[in-house]
Amino acid sequence: MPGLPTPRRLVASVNYRRTRTVEDSRMPLTEHLRELRNRVAIALLAFAIAGVVCFIFEPRIFDWLKAPYCDLPASKRFSPDGLAANDCTLYFFGILDAFTIRLKISMIAAVVVSSPVWLYQLWSFITPGLHRHERRWSLTFVGVSLVLFATGAVFAYLTLSTGLGLLLGFGGNGLVSVLDGNRYLSYVQAMLLIFGLSFEVPLLVMMLNLAGIVSTAKLRSWRRPEIFLVFVFAAVVTPSQDPFTMLALGLPMVLLYEVALIIGWLNDRRVARRGDTSPYADLDDDETSPLDFDDAPPRPAASAGPAATATSPGTANPPGTANPPGTANPVGTANPVGTGSSTPVGAGTAPVSPSTDVTHGDIT
């Protein structure tokens, strides 16, 4: 008939709906391992291809990494006789150092270039196990974390020249620094990684606040010790350990931390307006939360149909009532005298043994 779905279309619609349920999206462990193997293989393949391409363009990448050192004045760079005053050559002192430097630069660049592929594979493997709101929040936090890491790495690259100039300026009096290319590359790599990860700390604080683990009031009460610990952290983790690099890392972290406090304060106001505060939010950190078992919902009582009920052993029918069809009085009981109740004919009464006592007399 027109307007009605055909059986094939109806079955296809049902199958499409069933594939979207949680039960049908579950897979055995072997399927998960097989999917993980395939996604890891794709990520490694993308990394290998990016590594080959980056190895070809390694001289340009190395010139970009060497630019902060080349921006220093000639008085702070080692320029032996026969080289121009504006030369910024880095040196290596081992047989395999030149190849190691090129390989290290290619691998670092390959990780960055292939990051969209392996991040997508990681996201596709984790996403099926998340709910819709968890996917939304996780996607937001992943995007923000990538932006913060890239911002920290760029900020570290911009401050490399000033930090190097300050450190190499302590030479003089016949002391000239001859930079090893391998050590210089390790220094740049450590600075980019430390600044990028340090810029993620405010995001971690904001996640703890949104999860309800810590409130903004608690964080504000600890503000002075937290700022002090931030600068101590900046002084310890920076490879150069000079005051400029410490301030270059500590001040942005404090600024981002204040931004995280503002976002947490707005979240606390939203939660308080909705009335979603925890009943244990006012408890002290050392105080145990009470266990209340009175709020547990009562268990529903088991019910049975009226036709399947029968008198329990040792009881008799109420006055004026009769046994239901197909039932009999329990052994050892009888209907009360004068109640007018009787067992219907053919109701299937249970046989009475000779030793059973009956109300009308004993059967011998």
Curated annotation (Swiss-Prot):
It is a multi-pass membrane protein. It comes from the Bacteria. Belongs to the TatC family. The chain crosses the membrane at residues 42-62, 107-127, 139-159, 160-180, 194-214, 225-245, 246-266. It is found in: Cell membrane. Residues 301-320 have a biased composition (Low complexity). The keyword Transmembrane helix applies. It comes from Frankia casuarinae (strain DSM 45818 / CECT 9043 / HFP020203 / CcI3). Pfam families: TatC (PF00902). One of its GO terms (biological process) is protein transport by the Tat complex. GO terms for molecular function: proton motive force dependent protein transmembrane transporter activity. Residues 277-364 are annotated as: Disordered. Signal peptide: none annotated. One of its GO terms (cellular component) is TAT protein transport complex. The Tat system comprises two distinct complexes: a TatABC complex, containing multiple copies of TatA, TatB and TatC subunits, and a separate TatA complex, containing only TatA subunits. Substrates initially bind to the TatABC complex, which probably triggers association of the separate TatA complex to form the active translocon. Part of the twin-arginine translocation (Tat) system that transports large folded proteins containing a characteristic twin-arginine motif in their signal peptide across membranes. Together with TatB, TatC is part of a receptor directly interacting with Tat signal peptides. Residues 282-295 have a biased composition (Acidic residues). The keyword Cell membrane applies. Keywords: Cell membrane, Membrane, Protein transport, Translocation, Transmembrane, Transmembrane helix, Transport. Residues 324-344 have a biased composition (Polar residues). The lineage of its organism: Bacteria, Bacillati, Actinomycetota, Actinomycetes, Frankiales. This is Sec-independent protein translocase protein TatC. Its main location: membrane.
